[in-house]
């Protein structure tokens, strides 16, 4: 996405931690924990605001531009995401490229019409909305391209974003957005509770305040969000995680903070995105 400041912030934190570990009098583990806490706390408002904009602002079109504008018959387009690309993504894209156009259009229509039908069944006026939250697995771009076109015919622009990577925006090892096969699923699992290194009441409140401010800045965009349209996959090679004693875990107090933060985060979201005026669709492909 070209976010050089984010990269610079990470490099700065890395160098600070490296310096602590190189210095025999550097303070050890507690000094490292404090450095990480300070970095995450300082960057929290911007990280949360950036994520909020990703979720709502269609002008952030990094992924949508790949889907809509690249030559999908040239599988090198997959590497433009900057994500790990496995044989799963390559083989999926290659297979979809072999299908006739009418089949791909029908696959997309099943997805988009199911979304529209959800609004009809709920007696919700879709014409009031302008945005749809499109989530998918990398490799399905040919279907997603058709889906974006069909959503536009309904008056909806697709908002497409990467799964969250900043610690304050992640939800354990769950991935919401577009994503591919993990390079190391065990590593993702090991680090699902990293926020437990330093989560406290102040950090929880800092995130919630940042989220509320971000939604307030994008009140009109939030009001236009119709809800998620999710294209999932099944049949992947089974992953059996190993619980490692070295991995960070939450204390009972931190688990309570996490529960409060998730509850209050949902409440803030529903203040700006009316749950009674939204719907969703989920479809799964092998």
Pin down the residues of each PLM region:
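Active-site bordering "gate/hinge" segments
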Residues: 1-286
């Amino acid at each position: 996405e070209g976010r050089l400041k984010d990269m610079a912030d990470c490099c700065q934190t890395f160098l600070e931690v490296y310096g602590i570990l190189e210095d025999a009098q550097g303070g050890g583990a507690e000094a490292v924990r404090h450095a990480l806490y300070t970095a995450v706390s300082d960057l929290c408002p911007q990280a949360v605001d950036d994520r909020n904009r990703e979720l709502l602002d269609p002008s952030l079109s990094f992924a949508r531009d790949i889907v809509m504008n690249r030559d999908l018959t040239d599988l090198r387009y997959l590497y433009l995401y900057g994500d790990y690309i496995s044989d799963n993504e390559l083989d999926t894209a290659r297979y979809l490229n072999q299908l006739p156009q009418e089949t791909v259009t029908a696959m997309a229509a099943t997805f988009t019409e199911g979304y529209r039908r959800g609004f009809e069944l709920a007696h919700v006026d879709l014409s009031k909305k302008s945005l749809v939250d499109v989530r998918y697995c990398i490799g399905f771009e040919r279907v997603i391209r058709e889906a974006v076109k069909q959503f536009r015919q309904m008056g909806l622009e697709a908002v497409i974003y990467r799964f969250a990577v900043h610690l304050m925006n992640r939800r354990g090892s769950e991935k919401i957005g577009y994503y591919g096969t993990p390079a190391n699923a065990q590593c993702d699992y090991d680090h699902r509770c990293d926020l437990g290194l330093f989560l406290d009441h102040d950090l929880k409140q800092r995130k919630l305040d940042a989220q509320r401010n971000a939604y307030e800045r994008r009140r009109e965009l939030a009001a236009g969000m119709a809800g998620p349209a999710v294209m999932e996959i099944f049949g992947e090679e089974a992953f059996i995680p190993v619980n490692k004693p070295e991995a960070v875990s939450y204390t009972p107090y931190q688990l309570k903070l996490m529960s409060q933060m998730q509850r209050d985060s949902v409440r803030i979201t529903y203040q700006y995105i009316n749950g009674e005026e939204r719907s969703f669709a989920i479809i799964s492909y092998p």
